[in-house]
Amino acid sequence: TIPTQFGFVNVTTSESTAASIDAARNAYKAECEDAQAHYPKMKLLKKIDLKGCGTGRQLRFGHLLGNGEYQMVMAQCQKRVNRDAYGTISCLTAFDLDGNILWQHGEPTDNHDIGTISADMPMQIYDIDGDGFDEVITAKNFEVLILDGKTGEVKKRAKTPFSTPEEDGTIIGVPDKIYAFDRINPDGMRICNFRGLDKPRDILIKDRYCRVYALNDDLEVMWHFQSDKNTGHFPFAIDINGDGHDELLVGYNMLDCHGNKMWTMPVNEDHIDEIVPGRFESGPHKGSKFFACVAGKEGFLISDFNGKLLKKDGIGHAQRVSLANYLPNRPGYEMVVVNFWGHQGIIYFYDSEGNQLWEMENELNGNLLTPVNWTGDGQDFILLNADVERGGMIDGNGIQVVKFPDDGHPTTCAEAVNLYGDARDEIVTWDYDSMYIYTQDDAPKDDVYAPFKYPDYNASNYRGEYSYREKWW
C-alpha cells in the first residue's frame, strides 16, 4: 500500500488550543535550557579541510600508522546500472586528523550524488594480519583488497566470487532477478570470527540483498549462502552458543559458522536495516538474550536467540535502533528507534523490556540515535543530528541536553567516536568539504566510565548501536 501524498495541508485549531501548544513548547524549551546548564557544552577541537574528498556516511576510523592515534579513510562512490544496486568505490582517501592526506586511490569528484546512497561501501579498517598496524580491507573493480594502512599499497588481492548462471532467476533484490555482472560487486563488508581463532580474521562480503560470502584472511572463499529472504544491509556476527565461533544473523535467517541455516524468524517481508543484541535485565525474560531489529514496514522486532518473536511494534518503516543506559534510574538498557518515510521520522523510546514510554518528532531527517558517553558518569545521551536547533543530544526523557554551536559546521553527517583524551566521546560532523570535531568544554577526567560499544573495525551506516557496561556474549 502506498501512503497518500499531499501537495499542501493547512492545519487550523482554536485560539485556546494554539495557546496550549505554545505553552507546551515554551515549557519544553525552558526544561531543555535548564538541563543544558548542567552538562558540558561542545567545544570545537579541530576543523579539517577535506580537500574535496569528503563523502556521506562512508567514513571509517582506525589506527593506520600504529602510533596510538586515530586516522580515517573516506570513500566516494559511483553508482552503476540501477540506482544503488551496484555502487562501487571510485575514490578512497586516507587522512590523519590534521587533514593531511596519507594516500589516495582514485580521483575525488565534486558530484555530491556520491554521498546519497542506500548501501555501505565495502570498507573496514582492521589489523587483520596482526602486525600492529591496521590494514584497509576493501573491494573495487571486482577484487577484494587488503591495503597497507600506512601507504595504501596492496598487500593481498583476490577476485570476487562469480555470480553463477544457476543462481539467475532466484536472486532477490536485483532487477529481473538477474545479476548485472559476472562477479559479485560487494555491497558491504564485516570482520567476523567463523573459524574460532584468537581474534577475528574472517571477512564477510555480500551482494545487494541475497548472497553472503565468508572469506579467510588469505581472501579464499570458505562458504557462501544464498538467502530465500532479504539479507538486509549489515548481517550481525555473534557467538550465540558459546563455542568460540561466530554465528551470523543474515536478515531473518541465522546461520552457523559454516553457513548452514539454523533457524529463521517468522517474518518474510521487507528487510532488516539494523540489528542490536541485548540481554533482558528485568521482567519475565530476565537473563535471556535477544536481538532488537528494525525491519522496514515490518516495524520494530525483538526476537530471542532462537528466532522466536517476543515483541513486534508496527511503527511504520522502522529504520534505526540503539540500546544504552539512557535512564540510569531504571533497570537494564533502554531502546530507541526511529522510522523513515522518505523524510523526517518519529522517534520511539522503549524501556529495557520493549515497552514504549514516549515518542517525539523533530521534523528532521537522518536522526542517528547513536549512544554518546558525554559525561563519563554512566549515563548515555542520544545523538540525533547536527542541526543547531533540532539536533544535538537528548536524554532518555527526550530533553535536549547538548546543542551544537551555531558556528557554520557541516550538517550532512555526524557521529560519536572516542578520538582523544579520556574515555568520553567526541562528536564529528562532516560533509564533502570539511570536518569539525567537538569535545567537552571541561577538562579531561580521570576514572571516566568506559562503556563497551561497537568496535571501530565494523563500522556501517546500518549497524545499529549499543553501549553496555560490559560485553556479555
Model-identified regions with their sequence ranges:
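Beta-propeller-forming repeat regions
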Residues: 2-473
